[in-house]
């Protein structure tokens, strides 16, 4: 009996067994069993009968269940056969618990930070049938660190699993992220896909660079490239390319300085050639370039729109010999006397196939020395085939291959030698398979020829055939022999996709097994039917067309659909789920050792991935153990299991599992050494075996992968245009849509469904993909369907990120005409309210255009926002004489002038301390320099929990960055944001108060935010688990401790690998000094807070606290942990008695109290702390001599220490002080004080009784414009969720609180502050200059964009404080229409003379970080400002320098690009008219003709004054008129006004050009109350177009003997006849 089975199997697959009776003389019953090798118990069994009816062959399947396998520890199952009473055979089949595959799909291939990634998973068997399995998914950043873990439980109805979205953090690692998924019950087998994270905008067109050869020979005279630029919608780009070449060595790039050139496009294509002279000028000896690479950059500028897209062709090898020769596709054995087809693969240096290369093939047999030479050329796939007629008695075939490229010298040609052995047969018999080359599809027949050579061939009446695919035998059949050559036709079934091995064999009467095998490719196709198409087959649509998608698939299947803008795939397409990826994964299940044949008949089976056993057949000793021999690399990509099985066989049985498990990849990506430390109870020798096998697998897999990487109109006049009412405006431009799963039920007609979708407005090509999962037919990834949304005539509107009020900015429209005729027409621009254009009043802006066919033109227009409200622009272009048109609407974001500011104050509310009723008076004055016309708001917020405001704003989306107004660009800043959320989430968890927050999803979102923060922080982690403010700087002990502390706290809430925490702990332990203190090599914290002498105490306390927080996670993971902690405690104890300053004292007191409250040093330190604080009856705080931020942090540590020591009175007083120090929203001055204050306050709240009585009543009263009254109550139920009340922005507020409990009252006023020429500076001086950069301007005009200027910004500051500075930040606002040149910022950061350590670009702003500041001289930064939009009337903007940890120390200055424009020509035409329409009009000298109008206005106006001008000043944007009131005829809302009072009247700068107001002038001013704002006695009035502004004569003039008529007018004017 001959038994054939796969060389390995899975506990989740059936085991197919083929059985043949060698001696076909009698009917025999064969009993086939699967046996537990440990107990001998039968797992499954079948009985088959071999007889004449079935040609004495049988094919059966057995199954072993995963639950049974889990009961024993062996890595194999025993296959046993019994027949004829007592005869039996058995063989051990290696067993894997691999269950199947998991494929992942994302809704886009690339994302920007702060976006959501939608993920689908498709868990299937190796045969692609759906699996019901719970899954675990790790999201891994580019550094290989798991930043989020998502678990998804299986449900019967879900064949496609959609995960919750993964939120990419706002600050994170850019690059390639991984999605690592595995089935929950099989964590040892994981599957990887991915997505990319970059800061990008979708390209408007695709630029690709190709070279005529994929390498540069070191002596090449020329190197030619081809550049292709195509719009995403398929049309060629017209324009030019700026081409640059350079040399890359490792990561360093060197530009070939004389190689830059312009290349012009024709029909979207351009060509350029690099000449050898350009290289020799910089590298006279080309041989020095060997081993380096060439790169090519191309910036393509479209001539129509001026848009720029870039591309790079990278890593072009510079070589002396450009080719390599491989023979991996060659069958390793030949049959003597049968033509042998030798395949050679020639590769380029980049691994791509080298086509058209002449080669010389020489061969000889045995040791004859007689070489026969033939010449060939490689095909497109790099393969050249040579047929060699072999000699009948040859044992060895020698082959030499050499390239014959005529461009190369002989020494530069590639060559290789190979030896092919003959098939070995004792009788000289063999069988040879030859398949017809055409690749067939499932359902078709494959035809192949079988050739036999044997002296005993008359005894061979039939051949036996096995078809093996994906590690399984799919068919076993027998066909009769028809002479020396037999043609056989076999039906291809879907199970054989993508390829199968065909084994043919016969058995001679002598017992010799003769066999051959080949690999046959099957055309990739799905078993399941899936079709997604558009009804009618249409591929071209217009925006907003309804598209009917016809979906056809299997009944009861699930189809996942997604649509992506093809522009996204221009940026990254490697992670797209394709059918090819699925089939490649299936190929990995192949168990074969070679591409076919074998040394002997039995070895043919082994090399085909089969295990065989037979008693009657000779040569079986070679195959008694299944699997490939040493030295043979399998074609599959997943080789780990086989390597481990082979290695495990060299160990005793009790250690084989230790070795085998080493092959299973750790989900946490731990090293072999780290994994070994987790082995504890597996017996003696297991750790050593595991480590040795783990390293062996890594080395062998690396070798194997290296080998595998060798693979490869007509015109009807201008009187007709489409009516505007018929126009559809395009305004919806998503990157992806239609992320849906569609169920095809049995009730659907033949598995069909029609889906109707409206296409978005984008002019682009959409890539539409459908993936089907059928219960019966498995997974099918359908081909992409591309639909182009296009108009032959369309617009593209270019707008800046934001406009600023009163600034004049150019907007540009590009008109594309892809029709086959030139067109003329009209373009019409309408802007929303509050936008001035060059149009007539209440009319759209119109202009005519002419565009040639297949061309484009641009149209520009100026806009000026008059208000700070967002608006929109709508552009319509219509062609004369036709209905051809397009319209686009875009939002215009308008930012008010000035900077956002807020002022706030908090009060502790404790009525019981005030006799049961507490009265709080809130000053509500308007700050100086408020921008006129901007909204101002004031709020009062009262809550019954000291940290409620912080919790609300942290967890409910009120952005911390806005409240704190600090940048976040380094590792410490990022941790601050994460740690705040950790603090409040821990508090709500401990106090079980999530249900009181009023949002059931809040807990989940909070945990997601923490996970996202963890991911962001890993951006700053080094390989040794230490952290630095920036990766290129030295690691910081303090920051690493901060991270370890927060991660330890966060681990109680979300998944964070212990290895991350303990890795940092190990690094910290190495920073401990002999005396127990800790050393800091790169300070991050504010040095002033640490003190000159006590800095070591502060740092040691901080690290000590972090280690205690991490104790639970690391005490058993980190060797020596306890010793280090005890040494640190000893050091702090010795220093506690040394008269520490407030901050070191407070942090030391808290650190010692964490160790043990009863400790003597802890008690003494706490006593000292109590007596040193600044106390009142209700408050206590520490550290005020070091600034507000230091005082907050010191008091926070003092409060934490008091809580530990149960010092209730001290804790309550410290809590009161901290509560009153918070800003609106619950935040403080900077990062660390906010973090520690919040930890302390939540700690205080946590230790209060959960059942404490809360019943506070509040009454708010304001007397302004009548009476404002508001009453509300706070109880335990709403202590967290009380919202702020909006209160009047003017006038004193009185708040009366009564009842029981303790709360906090916060007042905040928000407003826009004018940019002033000079502001008060504290701790810094600052100088700003901006000048036109003529040299840069000239270069830009030669290359990229000639229209706009370039300016150079220089900012210099001096540090004026008498102490060492900490980190300094420069916050630089950019003028509208300008952007910072990124290369200059990179140079400031990266060059050896670096000025900054990091920068951060935000819309309209740049943050620069300096950690090296010279106290004794100026510190300067500088970069170029590129003008990207034309702007006139540009307003000044502000640059500010401040200390990061003490932001009160700052200096701000305004600056302005020195524009080359005439100030008198800053506006023109109707823009000026539009601006003036909103301006106050000076009526001139009083005149009797205006009497009626004057009196009518006096009756309508709410205030009527006659003023005398005392002073006129100008700011950046306004004229301020200070005046004394000479007559008050109507007071309006300003009831406190009287004659002689002083008031200010404000006019926008662009309105004051022709007013000529001077001190001493007298004016009549009448207007409405909504145009003024007040600040105590400094009420200011904004003069607008609704204001009556008339000049009155001077009193001295009216006393003249003959006064002018205007004097009579002024004397007679008494206002409205109705008294005001």
Swiss-Prot record:
| Location in the cell | Secreted
Listed GO CC annotations: extracellular space
> InterPro entries this protein is in?
A-macroglobulin_rcpt-bd, A-macroglobulin_rcpt-bd_sf, A2M/Complement_sys, A2M_N_BRD, Alpha-macroglob_thiol-ester_cl, Alpha-macroglobulin_TED, Anaphylatoxin/fibulin, Anaphylatoxin_comp_syst
- Residue ranges occupied by any Anaphylatoxin-like domain in the UniProt entry: 658-694
- Record domain NTR: where: 1479-1616
What keywords are assigned to this protein? Complement pathway, Disulfide bond, Glycoprotein, Immunity, Inflammatory response, Innate immunity, Secreted, Thioester bond
Q: Which GO terms describe its molecular function?
A: endopeptidase inhibitor activity
Question: Where on this protein are sugars attached?
Answer: 190, 989
Q: Where is this region: Properdin-binding?
A: 1406-1416
> CDD domains from the xrefs?
ANATO, complement_C3_C4_C5, NTR_complement_C345C
Summary of subunit composition and partner proteins? In absence of complement activation, the C3 precursor is first processed by the removal of 4 Arg residues, forming two chains, beta and alpha, linked by a disulfide bond.
Q: What role does this protein play?
A: Precursor of non-enzymatic components of the classical, alternative, lectin and GZMK complement pathways, which consist in a cascade of proteins that leads to phagocytosis and breakdown of pathogens and signaling that strengthens the adaptive immune system.
What name is this protein filed under? Complement C3
Q: Which organism is it from?
A: Eptatretus burgeri (Inshore hagfish)
């Amino acid at each position: 009996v001959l038994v054939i089975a796969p060389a390995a199997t899975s506990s989740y697959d059936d085991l197919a067994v083929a059985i043949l009776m060698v001696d076909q003389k009698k009917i025999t019953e064969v009993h086939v069993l699967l046996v537990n090798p440990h107990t001998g118990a039968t797992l499954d069994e079948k009985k088959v009968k071999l007889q004449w009816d079935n040609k004495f062959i049988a094919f059966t399947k057995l199954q072993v269940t995963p639950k049974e396998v889990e009961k024993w520890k062996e890595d194999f199952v025993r296959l046993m056969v019994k027949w004829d009473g007592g005869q039996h055979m058995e063989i051990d089949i290696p067993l894997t618990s691999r269950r199947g595959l998991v494929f992942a799909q994302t809704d886009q291939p690339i994302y920007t930070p702060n976006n959501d990634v939608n993920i689908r998973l498709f868990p299937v068997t190796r045969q692609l049938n759906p699996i019901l399995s719970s899954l675990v998914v790790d999201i891994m950043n580019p550094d290989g660190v798991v930043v989020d873990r998502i678990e998804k439980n299986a449900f019967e109805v879900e064949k496609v699993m959609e995960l919750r979205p993964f939120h990419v953090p706002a600050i994170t690692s850019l690059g390639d992220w991984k999605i690592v998924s595995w089935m929950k019950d099989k964590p040892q087998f994981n599957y990887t896909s991915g997505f990319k994270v970059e800061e990008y905008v979708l390209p408007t067109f695709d630029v690709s660079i190709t070279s005529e050869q994929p390498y540069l020979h070191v002596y090449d005279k020329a190197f030619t490239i081809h550049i292709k630029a195509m719009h995403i919608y398929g049309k060629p780009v017209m324009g030019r390319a700026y081409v640059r070449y350079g040399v890359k060595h490792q990561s360093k790039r060197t530009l070939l300085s004389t190689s830059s050139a312009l290349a012009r496009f024709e029909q979207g294509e351009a060509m350029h050639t690099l000449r050898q002279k350009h290289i020799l000028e910089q590298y006279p000896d080309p041989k020095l370039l060997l081993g380096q690479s060439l790169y090519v950059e191309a910036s393509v500028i479209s001539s129509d729109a001026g848009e720029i897209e870039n591309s790079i062709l990278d890593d072009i090898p510079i070589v002396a010999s450009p080719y390599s020769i491989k023979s991996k596709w060659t069958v390793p054995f030949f049959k003597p006397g049968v033509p042998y087809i030798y395949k050679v693969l020639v590769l380029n240096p980049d691994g791509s196939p080298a086509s058209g290369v002449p080669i010389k093939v020489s061969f000889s047999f045995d040791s004859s020395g007689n070489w026969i030479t033939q010449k060939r050329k490689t095909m497109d796939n790099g393969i050249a085939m040579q047929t060699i007629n072999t000699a009948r008695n040859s044992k060895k075939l020698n082959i030499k291959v050499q390239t014959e490229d005529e461009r190369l010298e002989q020494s530069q040609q590639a060559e290789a030698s190979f030896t092919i052995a003959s098939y070995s047969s004792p009788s000289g018999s063999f069988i040879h398979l030859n398949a017809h080359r055409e690749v067939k599809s499932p359902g078709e027949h494959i035809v192949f020829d079988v050739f036999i050579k044997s002296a005993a061939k008359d005894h061979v009446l039939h051949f036996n055939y096995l078809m093996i695919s994906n590690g399984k035998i799919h068919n076993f059949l027998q066909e009769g022999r028809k002479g020396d050559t037999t043609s056989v036709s076999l039906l291809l079934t879907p199970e054989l996709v993508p390829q199968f091995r065909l084994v043919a064999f016969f058995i001679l009467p002598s017992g010799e097994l003769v066999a051959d095998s080949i690999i046959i490719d099957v055309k990739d196709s799905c078993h399941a039917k899936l079709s997604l198409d558009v009804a009618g087959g249409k591929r071209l649509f217009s925006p907003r067309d309804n598209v009917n998608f016809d979906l056809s698939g299997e009944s009861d299947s699930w189809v996942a659909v997604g649509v992506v803008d093809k522009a996204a795939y221009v940026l990254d397409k490697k992670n797209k789920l394709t059918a090819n990826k699925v089939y490649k994964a299936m190929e990995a299940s192949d168990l074969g050792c070679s591409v076919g044949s074998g040394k002997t008949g039995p070895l043919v089976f082994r090399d085909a991935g089969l295990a065989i056993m037979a008693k009657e057949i000779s040569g079986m000793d070679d195959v008694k153990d299944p699997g490939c021999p040493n030295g043979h690399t399998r074609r599959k990509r997943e080789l780990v299991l086989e390597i481990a099985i082979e290695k495990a066989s060299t160990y005793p049985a009790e250690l084989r599992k230790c070795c085998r498990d080493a092959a299973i990849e750790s989900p946490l990506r731990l090293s072999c050494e780290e994994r070994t430390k987790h082995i504890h109870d597996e017996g003696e020798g297991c750790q050593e075996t595991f480590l040795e096998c783990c390293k062996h697998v890594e080395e062998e897999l690396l070798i194997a992968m290296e080998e595998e990487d060798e693979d490869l109109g007509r015109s009807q006049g201008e009187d007709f245009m489409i009516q505007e009412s018929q126009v559809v405006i395009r305004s919806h431009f998503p990157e992806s849509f239609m992320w849906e799963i569609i169920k095809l039920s049995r009730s659907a007609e033949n598995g069909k469904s029609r889906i109707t979708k409206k296409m978005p407005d984008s002019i682009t090509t959409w890539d539409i993909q459908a993936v089907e999962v059928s219960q019966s037919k498995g997974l099918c990834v359908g081909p992409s369907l591309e639909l182009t949304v296009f108009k032959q005539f369309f617009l593209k509107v270019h707008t800046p990120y934001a406009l600023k009020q009163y600034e004049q900015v150019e907007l540009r429209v590009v008109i594309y005409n892809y029709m086959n005729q030139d067109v003329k027409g009209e373009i019409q621009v309408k802007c929303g309210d509050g936008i001035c254009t060059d149009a007539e009043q209440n009319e759209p802006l119109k202009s005519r255009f002419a565009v040639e066919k297949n061309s484009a033109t641009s149209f520009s227009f100026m806009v000026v926002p008059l208000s700070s409200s967002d608006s929109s622009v709508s552009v319509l272009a219509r062609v004369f004489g036709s209905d051809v048109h397009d319209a686009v609407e875009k939002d215009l974001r308008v930012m008010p002038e000035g900077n956002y500011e807020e002022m706030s104050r908090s009060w502790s509310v404790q009525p019981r301390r005030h006799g049961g009723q507490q009265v709080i008076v809130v000053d509500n004055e308007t700050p100086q320099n408020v921008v006129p016309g901007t909204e101002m708001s004031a709020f009062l917020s009262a809550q019954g929990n000291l940290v409620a405001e912080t919790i609300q704003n942290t967890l409910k989306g009120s952005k911390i960055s806005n409240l704190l107004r600090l940048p976040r660009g380094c590792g410490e800043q990022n941790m601050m944001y994460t740690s705040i959320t950790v603090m409040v989430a821990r508090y709500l968890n401990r106090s079980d108060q999530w249900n009181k927050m009023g949002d059931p999803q809040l807990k989940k979102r909070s945990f997601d935010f923490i996970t996202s923060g963890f991911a962001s922080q890993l951006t700053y982690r080094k390989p040794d688990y230490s952290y630095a403010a920036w990766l290129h700087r030295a690691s910081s002990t303090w920051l690493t401790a901060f991270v370890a502390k927060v991660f330890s706290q966060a681990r109680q809430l979300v998944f964070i690998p212990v290895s991350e925490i303990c890795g940092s702990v190990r690094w910290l332990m190495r920073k401990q000094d002999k005396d127990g203190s800790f050393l800091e090599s790169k300070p991050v914290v504010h040095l002033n807070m640490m003190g000159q002498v006590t800095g070591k105490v502060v740092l040691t306390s901080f690290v000590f606290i972090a280690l205690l927080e991490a104790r639970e996670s690391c005490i058993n993971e980190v060797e020596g942990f306890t010793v280090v902690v005890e040494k640190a405690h000893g050091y702090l104890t010795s220093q506690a008695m040394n008269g520490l300053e407030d901050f070191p004292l407070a942090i030391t007191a808290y650190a010692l109290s964490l160790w043990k409250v009863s400790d003597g040093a802890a008690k003494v330190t706490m006593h000292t702390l109590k007596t040193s604080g600044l106390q009142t009856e209700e408050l206590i705080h520490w550290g005020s001599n070091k600034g507000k931020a230091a005082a907050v942090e010191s008091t926070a540590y003092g409060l934490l220490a008091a809580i530990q020591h149960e010092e209730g009175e001290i804790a309550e007083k410290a809590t009161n002080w901290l509560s009153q120090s918070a800003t609106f929203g619950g935040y403080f001055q900077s990062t660390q004080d906010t973090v520690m204050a919040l930890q302390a306050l939540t700690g205080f709240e946590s230790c209060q009784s959960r059942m404490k009585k809360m019943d506070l009543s509040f009454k708010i009263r304001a007397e302004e414009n009548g009476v404002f009254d508001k009453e509300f109550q706070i109880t335990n139920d709403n202590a967290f969720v009380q919202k702020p009340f909006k209160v009047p922005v003017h006038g004193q507020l009185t708040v009366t609180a009564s009842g029981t409990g303790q709360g906090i009252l916060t007042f905040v006023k928000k407003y826009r502050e004018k940019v002033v020429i000079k502001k008060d500076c504290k701790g810094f001086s600052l100088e700003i200059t901006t000048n036109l950069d003529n040299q840069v301007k000239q270069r830009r005009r030669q290359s990229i964009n000639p229209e706009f200027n370039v300016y150079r910004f220089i900012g210099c500051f001096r540090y004026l404080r008498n102490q060492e500075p900490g980190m300094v930040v420069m916050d630089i606002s950019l003028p509208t229409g300008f952007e910072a040149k990124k290369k200059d910022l990179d140079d400031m950061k990266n060059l050896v003379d670096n000025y900054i350590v990091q920068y951060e670009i935000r819309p309209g702003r740049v943050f620069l970080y300096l950690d090296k500041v010279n106290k004794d001289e100026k510190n300067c930064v500088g970069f170029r400002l590129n003008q990207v939009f034309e702007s006139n009337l540009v307003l000044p903007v502000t640059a500010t320098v401040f200390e990061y940890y003490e932001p009160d120390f700052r200096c701000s200055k305004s600056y302005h690009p020195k524009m080359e424009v005439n100030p008198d020509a800053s506006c023109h035409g109707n823009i000026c008219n539009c601006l003036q329409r909103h301006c106050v009009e000076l009526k001139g000298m009083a005149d009797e003709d205006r009497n009626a109008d004057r009196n009518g206005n006096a009756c309508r106006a709410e205030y009527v004054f006659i003023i005398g001008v005392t002073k006129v000043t100008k700011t950046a944007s306004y004229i301020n008129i200070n005046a004394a009131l000479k007559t008050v005829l109507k007071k309006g809302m300003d009831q406190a006004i009287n004659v002689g009072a002083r008031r200010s009247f404000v006019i926008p700068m662009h309105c004051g050009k022709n007013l000529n107001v001077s001190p001493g002038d007298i004016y009549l001013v009448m207007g409405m109350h909504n145009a003024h704002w007040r600040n105590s006695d400094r009420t200011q009035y904004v003069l607008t177009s609704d204001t009556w502004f008339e000049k009155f004569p001077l009193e001295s003039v009216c006393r003249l003997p003959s006064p002018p008529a205007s004097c009579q007018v002024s004397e007679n004017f008494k206002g409205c006849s109705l008294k005001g």
